[in-house]
Amino acid sequence: MTTIRDVAKHAKVSVATVSRVLNKKGYVSKEAEEAVLQAIKELNYQPSSVARSLYHKTSGMIGLLIPDISNPFFPELARAVEDVASTYGYTVVLCNTDEEIEKERKYLQALKQKYVDGVILTTSFLPYKEYEQLNIPMVALDRYVNENIPLVASQNKAGARLATEHLLEQGCQFIAHIRGPKGVTPAEDRYEGFKEVVEEQEVANIVVSADFHIDEAQKVTRALLETHPTIDGIFASSDVVAAGAMKAAHMMGKRIPDDLQIVGFDGIPLGNMLVPSLTTVEQPIYDLGAVSTRLLIKQIEKKPLDTYRYEIPTKLVVRETTKGGENSENA
């Protein structure tokens, strides 16, 4: 393996001169620079990324922390982050925390030690002080951390209002909301949107909680429908939760949408593959990842930010789990 000393010897210059050429710092004569570049080419020398990281305290890497790689929402998000990051010359390091505080803490410390240039958080289980102490540029994606960390999110509350209003427009009289975990920003915002509408319209409603997992959503829905058989509409806090609700309804002999109408939230491809296809509130997942990455790189490059809160609109996509239509879209 060719070393920096081999390059120096081949170019007949000092190691320090080679280092100055590689790092573009300090004076080097034109002749010496050309000799070094020629030696690098002839020897096919590849500078050590580790050594360069130690020298510059930078790595050309961006960390992306996600809570659950098995949730179809996050691979699509990661694709956007990777696409944008690569156009700016950055490599993305994906860290799956499994919604565990200690895993998140260990990943962040490891990224710090490797001089990662910035981090995109889709998890936020640690106290703000721990994020602050890392002293790394950060962006929170769909998870509010603190006013000092820029947030990129969908208009979750407005989207939840769209979903709930649609169920009412289709004749639902007793609506259940299967909300996500408490303390998770998008779940809280969607719950708030739902509650606003049912209280404004004075509609019979019930709220239960479930993690963003199909199996738990199925169990919660079954218990819900057994206890309250007159429920005729469900607004699920994610498409994955909606899929679990659909499975429970099917196993109980409920006809969708005749007996029970269901609306999800996310707009992942899974929704269109289900039978019947899922009516959902679609959020621009790719745009969320792309905007977050550009915002992070702006911080890394020490450029001023226009705002610390970016909200991206959602839209209602009406399919077969509600009576509003088949594979039609409403803005």
Curated annotation (Swiss-Prot):
GO MF annotation terms: DNA-binding transcription factor activity; transcription cis-regulatory region binding
Residue ranges constituting the HTH lacI-type domain according to the UniProt record: 1-56
Pfam families: LacI (PF00356), Peripla_BP_3 (PF13377)
InterPro entries listed in its UniProt record: HTH_LacI (IPR000843), LacI/GalR-like_sensor (IPR046335), Lambda_DNA-bd_dom_sf (IPR010982), Peripla_BP_I (IPR028082)
Source organism: Halalkalibacterium halodurans (strain ATCC BAA-125 / DSM 18197 / FERM 7344 / JCM 9153 / C-125) (Bacillus halodurans)
Name of the protein this chain belongs to: Ribose operon repressor
UniProt cross-references to CDD domains, sorted A to Z: HTH_LacI, PBP1_Qymf-like
Annotated function: Transcriptional repressor for the ribose rbsDACBK operon.
Gene3D superfamilies membership: 3.40.50.2300, lambda repressor-like DNA-binding domains
DNA-binding interval(s): 4-23
UniProt entry keywords in alphabetical sequence: DNA-binding, Repressor, Transcription, Transcription regulation
